[in-house]
């Protein structure tokens, strides 16, 4: 039980299901939240309040100014108050609706409302019937908590004794729902919609279009202008973006006087917002375009030239403007049979002969932009890397180029001529750092090695004992 009175109003918490009986006429049980009280005798607040303790507070009764509480000689009066029963008292907390703590700042409240309003906007949740209700609840909560006066009143009395449409100094019963159109509230705060048409505002909630583009390795590394087919919302070609059917006229909007803006009274505040009748155009379309239906924009299939920046990677997504819209393109880069990529660096293999590895020389390697002359130092080992600075991929978010690393691979022949085999056997005789054995070479007791007689005689017949072969020269070079 609670009672609060002032010179202007009296707020009494009435017990249900039955009001206290008064001699002459008794109060009837409330029907559908409406109470009619006919009082024909003296009424005092203590006597009336004492009868409420048995049932407990369940309803709100507001007695308006001019009611005599201690006694009156004038005719019986009628006090009729529309109110909700215990259900409104269980309304979800505004702070919980916005997901903010009770001590949240105005910046936090605005940020929470913005994020949730975008998430539950009816235009982005057309298949969810509860989205519109949730969107309205968010507007209702933000309308109260964004006003410091209303917020203090809500913190003190809660939704049961607060009317968001009233001013900070006036109290009345709870009406429920926001006093401003949720759509208008959203536009006013976050729409940036003072001079745009309603069709343009709708595009804010369109899902971004995503496309996949196939690229070769070289196209991704060096960049390319590639023609691409997209479906985008662009200016309607039939009405040229005007929205009305060609040959027809538009009507002046009398709702906003042609200004495109309307004034909304929200109690102690006056708010200027986009006209709900014409959507900010200042005019009404009588005969909408049959293609865009008055929006001024229509979905069109267009072939556009997409400038692919040099250095994009596989799976990378970029945002590109196309007409008045933006699209997202995810690149799928094919693997190269020559190059391997590591950021801005590329790697490739270069096969050289045994002679090139031993004696050194030059070789030609395929580069990303041109053929590269590679210098092979003597004694090059397999898998040794040779760095070619600045021959890699452009750095997409920086300056300069990556490097090209060439991995040396020594190509060993699978088949030898008799001459080549004899020369290799001659070279193997003088090798001392061999672990294991070599076919055709026999180890001696002193630790040296000699060719087998059959292999040696055959080699001498073909090569000639007095002829110095290629590998013999190599042997002298390494043993001298």
From Swiss-Prot:
* Polar residues bias: start-end ranges: 443-456
Q: Which domain of life is it from?
A: Eukaryota
The main location class comes to: mitochondrion
Quick one: which residues bind Zn(2+) 1?
236, 239, 289, 292
Q: Which InterPro entries match?
A: Apopto_cytoskel_mod, DnaJ, DnaJ_C, DnaJ_domain, DnaJ_domain_CS, HSP40/DnaJ_pept-bd, HSP_DnaJ_Cys-rich_dom, HSP_DnaJ_Cys-rich_dom_sf
Q: Which residues carry this modification: Phosphoserine?
A: 398
Membrane topology recorded in Swiss-Prot or TrEMBL? Peripheral membrane protein
Q: Which PANTHER family match?
A: DNAJ HOMOLOG SUBFAMILY A MEMBER 3, MITOCHONDRIAL
Supply the name of the protein.
DnaJ homolog subfamily A member 3, mitochondrial
Q: What is the lineage of its organism?
A: Eukaryota, Metazoa, Chordata, Craniata, Vertebrata
């Amino acid at each position: 039980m609670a009672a609060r009175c002032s010179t202007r109003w009296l707020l009494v918490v009435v017990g249900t299901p039955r009001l206290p009986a008064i001699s002459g006429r008794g109060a009837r049980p409330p029907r559908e939240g409406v109470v009619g009280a006919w009082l024909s005798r003296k009424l005092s607040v203590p006597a009336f309040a004492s009868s409420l303790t048995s049932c407990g507070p369940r309803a709100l009764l507001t007695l308006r100014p001019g009611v005599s509480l201690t006694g009156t000689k004038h005719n019986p009066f009628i006090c009729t108050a529309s109110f909700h029963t215990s259900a409104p008292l269980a309304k979800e907390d505004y702070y919980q609706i916005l997901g903010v703590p009770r001590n949240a700042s105005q910046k936090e409240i605005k940020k929470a409302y913005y994020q949730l309003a975008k998430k539950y906007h009816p235009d982005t949740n057309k298949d969810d019937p509860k989205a519109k209700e949730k969107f309205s609840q968010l507007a209702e909560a933000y309308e109260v908590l964004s006003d410091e006066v209303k917020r203090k009143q809500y913190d003190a009395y809660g939704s049961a004794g607060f009317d968001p449409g009233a001013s900070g100094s006036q109290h009345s019963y709870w009406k429920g729902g926001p006093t401003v159109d949720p759509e208008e509230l959203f536009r006013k705060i976050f729409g940036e919609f003072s001079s745009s048409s309603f069709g343009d505002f709708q595009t804010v909630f369109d899902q971004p279009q995503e496309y996949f583009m196939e690229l070769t390795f070289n196209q991704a590394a060096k960049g390319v202008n590639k023609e691409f087919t997209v479906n985008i919302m662009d200016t309607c070609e039939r009405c040229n973006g005007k929205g009305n059917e060609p040959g027809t006229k538009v009507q002046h909007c009398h709702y906003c006087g042609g200004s495109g803006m309307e004034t909304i009274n929200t109690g102690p505040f006056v708010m200027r917002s986009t006209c709900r009748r014409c959507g900010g155009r200042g005019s009404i379309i009588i005969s909408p375009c049959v293609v865009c239906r008055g929006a001024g924009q229509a979905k069109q299939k267009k072939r556009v030239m997409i400038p692919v920046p040099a250095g994009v990677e596989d799976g990378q997504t970029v945002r590109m403007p196309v007409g008045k819209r933006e699209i997202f393109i995810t690149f799928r880069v094919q693997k190269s049979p020559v190059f391997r990529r590591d950021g801005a660096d590329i790697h490739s293999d270069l096969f050289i002969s045994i002679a090139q590895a031993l004696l050194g020389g030059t070789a030609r390697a395929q580069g990303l932009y041109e053929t590269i002359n590679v210098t092979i130092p003597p004694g090059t080992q397999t898998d040794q890397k040779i760095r070619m600075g600045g021959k890699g991929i452009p750095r997409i978010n920086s300056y300069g180029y990556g490097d090209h690393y060439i991995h040396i691979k020594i190509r060993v022949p699978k088949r030898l001529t008799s001459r080549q085999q004899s020369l290799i056997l001659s070279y193997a005789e003088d090798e001392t750092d061999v672990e294991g054995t070599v076919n055709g070479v026999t180890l001696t007791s002193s630790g040296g090695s000699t060719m087998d007689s059959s292999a040696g005689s055959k080699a001498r017949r073909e090569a000639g004992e007095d002829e110095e072969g290629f590998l013999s020269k190599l042997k002298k070079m390494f043993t001298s």
